[in-house]
Amino acid sequence: MTKGWGPLGWATLHSISALYPDNPSALEQEMFSRWLVSFTQTILCPSCMKHFSDAVAAYTHMNPTWKSSRRGVVEFVMRAHNSVNSRNHRKMYTFAESITELEKILPSALAPTRRQEYLSYIRSDWMKNMTIEGISTAPKIRELNMIEENYWSKRSFEWYELSVFSDINVSPIANVSSSLTNSGGALIPRLSMPQGGFRLKTFGRIGPLSSLRS
């Protein structure tokens, strides 16, 4: 990943991992999976998008149930971030160092603002791209906005809450490369948007809005 990824993207990922429920319902896990697809496919830097998609695929192959808990999502995001740091020959952060940095650069009270700034940034940039690829991102950006408005923005967190996960593995994700398509002979599917997208309405495509806990 390059500077094109931007600190706002990582701020969004880290805050979402902190907001994720400790024991998400099946609906919440499906919502997060779809959010992750839209997030990945709207990354502005093509190589960053490729690297992140590969990281998700590799990690899911190693740990298929990682979306079933906040612990799992926090671990994935920290390992993905350290994977980028390792690739770019930058400092890799321990869990404690990561939390200290996040408390400084992303106070929990400012997290919703940073996520909105990220959404505005990618929307503005993609709307300048009048190609088929650029136009096709519009539904994904709308989906990110809808999930932010109806779910993430209604939740809150404090960084200290994550101290219970101090024993998680934060090392770089192994075997992540831009050409990753399989591992051990088993196909790793690329991320793709489910047909019709995801709607958070009174009765959405995968269940009632009331099933999502605030």
Q: Where in the sequence are the language-model features?
A:
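Mid-to-C-terminal functional-domain signal that highlights helix-capping/loop sites
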Residues: M1-T42, P46-S214
